[in-house]
Amino acid sequence: MAEARRIRESHWGDVVTYSRKVFVPLTNMCRDTCGYCTFVKHPTSPEANIQTPEQVLATAKRGEAKGCKELLFSLGEKPEERYDAAKAALARLGYSRMTDYLADMCALVLRETTLLPHVNAGTLAEDEIERLRPVAASMGMMLETISRRLNKRGQAHFACPDKTPIQRLRTLERTGQRQVPFTTGLLIGIGETWEERVDALVAINEVHLRHGHIQEVIIQNFQTKPGIAMENHPEPSLEDMLRTIAAARIILSPEISLQAPPNLSERHIDYLQAGINDWGGISPVTIDFINPQHEWPEIRQLAASSEEAGFRLQERLTIYPRFLRHRDTFLDAGLHASLANMARQDGLARSQCLETSPCNSELPTSTAAEL
């Protein structure tokens, strides 16, 4: 792990970041049936829904009032292509394709709030990326694994058309060709081998070397949940997670941010020592809808853990500073003004919400590393 720490510190210095976000689950219907998922609801469930524009905007306004800068749209993949009920629900909103509705909700958020949309819509075709790029500051999709074995019967991704590795890799390539700032990552402990983890990290890095668009990689640990198909599947150990984080830091280009969810483990200092430099999105308003049994940590708690490990917590935007410096390449021109107003000189958030000072206080740029 010493080499992972050296790489992290040489490129990211003593700063560890987080993004203050609000989470909007635009729809919890999905055509995939992953064995570890508790987010997705069948259209016959009374809990199945597509959020209305009014609901989206109400959540966005609550987040804006709490100092959030990012709005994360997360949604199931293409439910309208599998379920008539999902197709009908979308039609009642005036749409035939979920991606088009998502794009209009991003535009609504940009028009009515100061929040920047980050879109996590799964696999995307070329025209879907083109539709979303002008209204999404960044996009994301977990690669999760490169293992085709896990698509077989009895495995985590059986009967999941969007979870075949080739489809995930094609989305990474397509977003790279269109210069979209992109988040991806691995889900650890769903049946993959160590070699398959390494292969997945290498595949992510290769597409980044071609296009330079991967802004962060998440190393996320599988968590069992009541009622899922993998309820009795073992969770990865702390040692397994730390080895994977360190391997990721060594394999990936140093400029790629490395993140691990802070609400899925309390061993924050261990994660920092293994090589991460970012805590991801944390919401003061909404729960983690993907892992609802795990509460977000308090920002002051993360700040204290970071300080104990020798780091200074800073708030970032959904776009990392490197992409802001090359905004003409990576960002639609319509987003430039909003980002300029929200970012300070070093590219981090102008208004720092660290729970130790008012959210509207701007810290001097000299207190943050040039990332």
Protein language model annotation of sequence segments:
Residues 13, 112-114, 134, 253, ...:
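Short, well-ordered coil/turn elements that cap or connect secondary structure elements
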